[in-house]
């Protein structure tokens, strides 16, 4: 009897372990993380993965500059993912796993750049589209799907579309060898205004038309750099802020951040890109224009055009026959 009991206990333990780690045990198709990152439209920022999918979460952290936050109600699965991340050399600054429910996500409104869930069949009963949209930043994207649905692919697809069917979103669905997926994008923030120039606009009238930020004023995020040099100029457009830091430091802690452009998410503070300014660059002037697509800056005898999301050079503007250094 003791042998039978021991055998039964071992079988039960194996079944429980397999159920807890079933998704993680199935290797993800090659390139799935790239497809999801492409559909999500971001490489830096904050990505929330709902439900443990260890292999996918680790690949997302490795192949991007995203901070990946994984949330799952099962403590055993969370502990297992932490161990796998530690063994893979992926630290907490790149991937953090937390145990908790999904009905109320632990994120402030308008915070997360990308939300991914690959176990829709298990999660849809716990997760609402309204809660996902609340946590997403404006124009942020959620990709919800079922990996390896097998013969239930059609049924899974129908459930996903029904789950995401909201009047203010236009879901996009696709099926591929990796599974069935649906993508929803949060609408832009109504009433939000840009601050494209040093004094708000080209007319130098520093009055915002923003209808969103109202008293009582609350902190949206705290993020590095916490200390900057001076002078400094901030412009904002398309949900991003562009901080230009000058040449003066009053403390050692500010040295490394002098003469620099720092582009950050206006919703969660994550640094999207940085660019060193030339020695002697004068920051305290109207040298920058921020738009949703392009960041313009004076650079010697030209105007440099940078991709607002990545900081990559897009081109330049020169005035024929005009020479000078601004």
Question: What feature does the model see in each segment?
Answer:
Residues 80-105:
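S-adenosyl-L-methionine
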Residues 266-268, 307-310:
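Short loop/turn segments that connect beta-strands within beta-propeller blades
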């Amino acid at each position: 009897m003791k042998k039978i009991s021991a055998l039964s206990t071992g079988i039960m333990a194996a079944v429980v372990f397999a159920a807890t780690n079933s998704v993680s045990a199935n290797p993800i198709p090659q390139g799935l993380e790239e497809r999801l990152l492409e559909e999500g439209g971001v490489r830096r920022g904050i990505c929330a993965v709902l439900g443990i999918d260890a292999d996918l979460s680790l690949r997302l952290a490795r192949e991007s500059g995203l901070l990946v936050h994984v949330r799952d109600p099962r403590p055993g699965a969370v502990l297992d993912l932490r161990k796998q991340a530690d063994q893979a050399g992926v630290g907490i600054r790149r991937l953090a796993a937390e145990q908790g429910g999904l009905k109320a996500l632990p994120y402030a409104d308008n915070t997360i750049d990308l939300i991914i869930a690959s176990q829709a069949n298990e999660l849809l009963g716990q997760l609402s589209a309204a809660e996902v949209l609340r946590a997403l930043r404006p124009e942020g994207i959620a990709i919800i799907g079922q990996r390896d649905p097998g013969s239930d692919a059609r049924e899974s697809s129908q459930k996903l579309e029904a789950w995401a069917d909201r009047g203010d979103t236009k879901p996009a669905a696709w099926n591929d060898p990796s599974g069935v997926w649906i993508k929803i994008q949060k609408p832009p923030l109504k009433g939000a205004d840009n601050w494209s120039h040093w004094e708000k606009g080209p007319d130098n009238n520093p009055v915002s038309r923003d209808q969103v930020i109202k008293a009582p004023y609350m902190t949206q995020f705290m993020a590095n750099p916490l200390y900057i040099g001076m002078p400094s100029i901030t412009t904002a457009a398309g949900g991003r802020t562009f901080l230009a830091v000058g040449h003066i430091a009053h403390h050692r802690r500010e040295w490394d951040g002098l003469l620099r452009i720092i582009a950050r998410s206006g919703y969660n503070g994550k640094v999207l890109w940085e660019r060193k300014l030339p020695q002697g660059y004068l920051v305290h002037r109207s040298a920058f224009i921020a738009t949703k697509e392009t960041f313009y800056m004076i650079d010697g005898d030209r105007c440099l055009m940078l991709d607002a999301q990545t900081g990559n050079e897009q081109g330049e503007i020169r005035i024929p026959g005009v020479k000078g250094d601004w």
